[in-house]
Amino acid sequence: MAGGLALSGATVRVLDPSGKAIATGKAVSATTGTYGPITLTGTGTFRVEACGTVADKPLCVWGLTNTGGTLHLTPMTSAIAVLASGLGPEALMNGALAAIPDATLANVHTQLRTALAPALADAGLAAGFDLLAGALTPGAHTGYDRLLDTVGVSLGTDTKAFVSLTSRLGSGTAYLEPGTTQGSLSVDAAAASVDLPALDALFAKLIGATASNAACVNSQTGLASLMDPNARASIDPATSAFTGATQAAQIICLRLNGVLGEGEVMFGGKLLPTTLGRCALGAGDPLCRVDFVYQNSKGFQRRLGVEQAAVKRGSGWVLLGNRLEVQATAVSRVVLTRRVDATAADSTARYLDISIPALTVSGGAVLQCARVSQLDASGNSLPLAFFKNAGSGSYLSLWSASSSDATPSLDPATGALRGADQVALPLASGAAGDAVARNFARAGRALQIDLYSDSACATPLSGLDGASISIDLAGLPPIAAASQSGQPWPALATAANSALAALKVAANAKLTYNPTWTTTRAGLAFNRAQLCPDKACSTRLAETELAAGATTAALSATLGSTALADNAYKLLRLTGRTLDGLVLQLDAQSCSALPAGSPC
């Protein structure tokens, strides 16, 4: 059982053909990834699910079997399960499942292997390798495990269930629906130079070098000794980087020791193992995007820098730090808005949160404008939005149709800014938004960001990155409405809903609210809970950080001079992220002054 590394803290659940759970909570070995044995009784197609974490990410994987025996659970077996059943992840483990003939499973297996052919060859595997039961050693980074390391697998539902495959060591996207494949992935000729066991060894050294302040600053074995001479590190994405191994290491060590950043001392925790990101090969030394995530002593995760990279020099892998001078990020987010004090229809909305620092780059030019575009399945570049410098704030703001309309304006000469740090790009709720999401599934998640030094978006920026950069979107936006509502959303307990509706606090009095919830399915790592008196959550009455597996939050604060009435608008916002970085945001609202049936 693996996703390139053995799942940590994982358990297995098995459903019989009727949808009845015949095994739950069966532990998975954290060292070998093995599970079972589990006895199957009856005939038909059994569904097997394992959920846990890989490095800093939550992961659920699935498999189908008619006969039992050895069954791996990996992203590849998940792809087979989705294509053979015709069900997306939101529906796969719900209800009864009609028997799937062995011939159908075999045909889907062949379809997937055909799409994976270049990656199978790179991993040294035969074209007919058994993805369901072939030899697999989690964490070995060779053979089947290398395949899991180097191929990105996304699952979802459009008009049909689909699988999207991308190569981290090459280019292209293979898009599969039951019985059909569009596009293809390729592996770079220099892919063999990406020595993953050696990259793993670098991170083992980095884990040791960041274990304590003394280890971090050690002149012989400390962080600087593991960084490239051209390494870059920043206090935050909106500030210029410090360059060189010594200065970059100092910045990171000071951040970990609480001297820089938000003042939190992180030593006493640990750096988490990385999972491989997209690699740049062919021209120059191999460079791969990596995660640099530190888990503090309380179990909370801190991402140190964005778009971090490691580079393989003649002497081996070293940490490069910031891949880009302009450390832009893009994250897909889905918001579920639910009224909890009375009956009303739920609503969902999709966003791309594109954060582009309003930075002064090398040479002194200031970033004033950026044009963001994606590719469609035919390779055409499609503009999504412009972002401009608002004159304040840390990030460029969306160039909108008007000051009261967040619809993006695609004309840099016509439009308006709606304030500082307006990074959210809304996707339309209908076909237009679906088309944008569909392009990410069929043509890959790369976003091109063209950079300009003038507000007219006409003069290319001169900096270390050149006039444009490419970043990957974290999280695949769900396409079908059922896929949006079928994400692993938290469901507040009835008592939590009632308590939010009844919550009232006198001026200058203490507020206490302790909501609890369950999740509709596994695969969401929580990170924050907020209690707010406005829909934008611009004012926060209370907030708290959450552990990934949280099922409750303790919110408390002392109110100011304005009382909170029981019939006032109140918002509980819970946020978390899925395996591929998709952010899920539940906005649970109470507005008892409005009639039932109306949205807040």
Residue ranges and their predicted role:
Residues 1-3, 346-364, 493-531:
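Aromatic/hydrophobic beta-strand junction motif of beta-rich domains
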Residues 68, 327-328, 461-487, 580-600:
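Short beta-strand elements
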Residues 276-279, 405-442, 551-566:
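Signal that preferentially marks extracellular ectodomain short beta-strand elements
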